[in-house]
């Protein structure tokens, strides 16, 4: 999951990481804390029956795209400029190839067989520049298929509980998308059946951005939508009733949006340790069929 915003890296303390929500002292505030916007975090058992966070950042490099000589894109922007001969179109940060990511697919039981077949046979591509042969992915392993269980967490009345966004959250209200803190808190409180009131001495940590994409069939661009960023953290006071460990609200649930993790404060205090993790690597598979098809097309066109 994207690293929650309560996890920070202390720039003036050799990059040490901590969960500032459970820090009793405030000395860390003077060590230039930085949120880890590009990092991923996962919970794991360190062998002492105590859960902790492992945080890892993917390797990034910059890709530069230039126009092909003689094409329309290679023409000078205006007659007064002498640009040409491979004019640069744009550049973008890209994740290194070969990294292994994991996730969970939730579907109705009767469709599980079809979903598994699709995952195994489909050509998976994510992100931008699909036409430039980037972001090709292959399925490495399906670790297991099991029934979805919804755990309930016991809470005490007035106990602070934290809602951590595991994915971006898009919420509509009266026909428009909203991102203001009060409206988002109202939507989350209604789903959890708790008060919108902020517990004393607590605060939210949230960010917003704009999301977009393309239609699967015709590759038409979807409208851009403002959304609350994954990793945002909201705090509420429990009503004393059991709460689910995970909820999903908002728009685009079929695309994995709006997944929220619920943590009572006593559980949050157990997650004081934050350690450096890693992202597994594998040699990217060579797209032999794609290379052969491109070669044939180039040969014919020549």
Go through each PLM region and give its residues:
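Conserved active-site/ligand-binding neighborhood in enzyme cores
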Residues: 1-302
């Amino acid at each position: 999951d994207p690293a929650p915003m309560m996890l920070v890296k202390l720039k003036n303390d050799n990059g040490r990481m901590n969960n500032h929500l459970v820090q009793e002292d405030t000395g860390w505030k003077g060590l230039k804390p930085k949120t880890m916007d590009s990092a991923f975090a996962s919970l794991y058992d360190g062998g002492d029956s105590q859960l902790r966070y492992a945080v890892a950042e993917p390797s990034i490099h910059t890709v530069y795209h230039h126009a092909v000589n003689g094409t329309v894109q290679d023409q000078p922007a205006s007659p007064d400029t002498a640009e040409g001969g491979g004019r640069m179109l744009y550049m973008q940060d890209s994740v290194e190839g070969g990294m292994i990511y994991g996730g969970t697919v939730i579907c109705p039981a009767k469709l599980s067989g079809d979903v598994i077949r699709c995952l195994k046979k489909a050509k998976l591509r994510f992100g931008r520049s699909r036409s430039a042969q980037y972001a090709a992915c292959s399925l490495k392993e399906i670790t297991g298929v099991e029934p979805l269980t919804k755990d309930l967490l016991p809470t005490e009345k007035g106990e602070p509980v934290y809602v951590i966004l595991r994915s971006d959250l898009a919420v509509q209200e009266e026909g428009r998308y909203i991102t203001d803190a009060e409206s988002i808190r109202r939507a989350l409180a209604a789903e959890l059946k708790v008060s919108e009131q902020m517990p004393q001495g607590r605060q939210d940590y949230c960010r917003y951005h704009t999301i977009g994409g393309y239609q699967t069939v015709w590759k038409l661009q979807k409208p851009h939508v403002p959304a609350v960023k994954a990793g945002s953290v909201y705090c509420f006071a429990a009503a004393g009733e059991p709460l689910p460990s995970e909820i999903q609200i908002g728009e685009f649930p079929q695309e994995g949006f709006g997944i929220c993790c619920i943590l009572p404060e006593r559980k949050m205090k157990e997650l004081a340790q934050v350690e450096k993790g890693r992202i597994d690597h594998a040699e990217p598979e060579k797209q032999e069929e794609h290379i052969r098809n491109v070669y044939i097309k180039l040969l014919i066109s020549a």
